[in-house]
Amino acid sequence: MKTKTAQQSLENFKRALDSLKNAVSKPNLSELELAGAIQNFEFCYELLWKTLQKHAAASGRRIVTPREAFQFAHQAGLIQDEKLWLDMIEDRNETVHTYDQTNAEHVYQEIKNRYFPAFLDIFKKLSDLLS
């Protein structure tokens, strides 16, 4: 995956990840901040699966959905807990298509406790591949 496109994609993911880090490290979010944190999660999600898509293409595999991208990452050893990533797909789809305050708070806790650490882990692994 040592292509300029893949490197740029990973840099974009890193910027979104830094923004998400600020959101998950802040206690007691207002409703607006909660919505912003979820939006940052959605950015990270989109940028990551697109980065994985580029990585797969560099190895000759065509990926067209986030589910395929995360399955590819699991097969490539970039992620361990495939269920976490499948849960992430469901939560991301829920936040994009509907907004409910109670669900938003639930998804935020998932982001903070499960998804953000998973993003950090895969970022490190992808960074190592590019060096």
Mark where each language-model region is:
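Solvent-exposed interaction patches of small proteins and small membrane subunits
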Residues: M1-S131
